[in-house]
UniProtKB/Swiss-Prot annotation:
GO terms for molecular function: glycine hydroxymethyltransferase activity; pyridoxal phosphate binding. The keyword Transferase applies. The gene is glyA. This is Serine hydroxymethyltransferase. SUPFAM superfamilies: PLP-dependent transferases. PANTHER family: SERINE HYDROXYMETHYLTRANSFERASE, SERINE HYDROXYMETHYLTRANSFERASE 1. Belongs to the SHMT family. It comes from Leptospira biflexa serovar Patoc (strain Patoc 1 / ATCC 23582 / Paris). Its EC number is 2.1.2.1. InterPro entries: PyrdxlP-dep_Trfase (IPR015424), PyrdxlP-dep_Trfase_major (IPR015421), PyrdxlP-dep_Trfase_small (IPR015422), Ser_HO-MeTrfase (IPR001085), Ser_HO-MeTrfase-like (IPR049943), Ser_HO-MeTrfase_PLP_BS (IPR019798), SHMT-like_dom (IPR039429).
Amino acid sequence: MSYLEKQDPEVYAALKKEDERQEHSLEMIASENFVSRPVLEAYHSTLTNKYAEGYPGKRYYNGCENADRVEELAIERAKKMFGAEYANVQPHSGAQANMAVFLATLEPGDSFLGMNLAHGGHLTHGSAVNISGKYFKPIPYGVDEKTETINYDEVAKLAKEHKPKLIVVGASAYPRVIDFNKFREIADGIGAKIMADIAHISGLVVAGEHPSPIGVCDFVTTTTHKTLRGPRGGLILSSSEHEKILNSRVFPGIQGGPLMHVIAAKAVAFGEALQPDFKTYIKQVVKNAKTLAEVFQKRGFRVVSGGTDNHIVLLDVSVKGLTGKDAADGLDHIGVTVNKNAIPFDKNPPAVASGIRLGTPALTTRGLKEKEIEAVGNLICDYLEHFGDTSFESKVKAAVKEITGAFPMNHFRLED
């Protein structure tokens, strides 16, 4: 019996069930992945007990020599991964990283360009319900109605019209390559700075499967989970000239003490991403996503933008008479985890949506390749085409169990 099970059986039971859910379901939420045992071990370390306000060598507390070393390793590895001059590993999340850059470049009420949430952007890129949309003045840009890819002409037009101080580049549901150089040209034309939020594609950037924004954009932010396979957290990258202002905007600007156990886990994950097999992994992630998109298209489903260049497949389920919510809830019932997602020019409200977003990072971590992904894609199509047929569900559930059984999880369990 573990210490946790003995002291708090209720929490233990919930965590045990989550272990089982991850083990016996197909995780296809694009923003989720599975960390390695070493990453989890670092995350579970006694650094969770240590307060370390400030930065290495400049702390406000004593006893930080080991925390300093861990953070220095994380910084060094982050810079090496991306080829950046500066890295701040302290942001608790991608949202915190984005806000730090906003506060370093904008004053309250200043305007900035950001991708429309309904077209694949992110809450922190100017949504009215987010602080980025309340504190500053967002000017949304979107995708072309026919191609469903970024409308760079619209971006240029909006930039000239509004002359924002900052242009935010990046998305949370955009399956195509982003042309950072085009954004640079637009920004240079009006004297604006650029922040690239590569939270979803950072692993692809590290592995060379997507063009890098380093040296093109002024600021780069990312989460450290998703395709990087690290703990949940944030990261800021830039040139050394912005070090002082960015550091001050993170601490003491929007955060107090850093989460040192998370930074330790980041350091381990960054070390893993620097290994040759990480490139192999990311290449497989992209191959799997392309395979998945092809299956959907062959089966008569509409894939937004006609395919994918990264790890995301955005599927329009309305062509089958379904809503995104119905499809996501139904798939969850059979052990396939996705999320409902708006598609460009969606007629349904966000809480219902017309699409689902699928990703291949977690299944690829689990070991699935094109053959298995093709089977998963067909399984999803079979279920959606027989939606509501309870007699068919048992067949699909059995197929899911067969796949998960063949590719067991490799992560800590409570009894380890």
